[in-house]
Amino acid sequence: MPTINQLIARPRVVQKSRKKVPALQQSPQKRGVCTRVYTTTPKKPNSALRKVAKVRLTNGFEVIGYIPGEGHNLQEHSVVMIRGGRVKDLPGVRYHILRGVLDTQGVKNRKQRRSKYGAKRPK
C-alpha cells in the first residue's frame, strides 16, 4: 500500500484495456489482399487441416484470417473482407474472412445458415 507522499510523487496510472481486434481500428470490417493461403493444424484435443490466409489490410496491418465453410476459391492476391472473431483452437487467428464478398465466393450447396456463408437462396 503506497503512502500519501508516494501517491503525490507518482499518481496511479489507469490501465488501458487490451483490444481483441486491434487491426480493425474500431471498424466493423476491413478490406485486404491475401499474401499467403495455407492450412494449419489446431491445438491439442482437435485434429484437422484448417484453412487460413495471411492478409495485408488497407491500413498496413498483416493479420491471419480464418476461411469458414467447405471449400474456397482464395489464392494469393485475392481481395477479401475480414471481420473480427477468433478461432479458439488456432493460436494467432483473431479474424474471419467474409464469404460471398469481393473475391471470396459463397459456399456451394449450403442450405442452412446461408447468410453466414454468402450462399444464395436455392431455387
UniProtKB/Swiss-Prot annotation:
Gene3D superfamilies cross-referenced by the UniProt entry: Nucleic acid-binding proteins (2.40.50.140)
Pfam families tied to this protein: Ribosom_S12_S23 (PF00164)
Superkingdom assignment: Bacteria
Modified residues (3-methylthioaspartic acid): D89
PROSITE patterns assigned: RIBOSOMAL_S12
Disulfide bridge partners, by residue number: none
A GO CC term attached to the entry: small ribosomal subunit
Record function comment: With S4 and S5 plays an important role in translational accuracy. Interacts with and stabilizes bases of the 16S rRNA that are involved in tRNA selection in the A site and with the mRNA backbone. Located at the interface of the 30S and 50S subunits, it traverses the body of the 30S subunit contacting proteins on the other side and probably holding the rRNA structure together. The combined cluster of proteins S8, S12 and S17 appears to hold together the shoulder and platform of the 30S subunit.
Subunit structure: Part of the 30S ribosomal subunit. Contacts proteins S8 and S17. May interact with IF1 in the 30S initiation complex.
Similarity comment: family membership: Belongs to the universal ribosomal protein uS12 family.
HAMAP family xrefs: Ribosomal_uS12_B (MF_00403_B)
Protein known as: Small ribosomal subunit protein uS12
The species this protein was found in: Rhodopseudomonas palustris (strain HaA2)
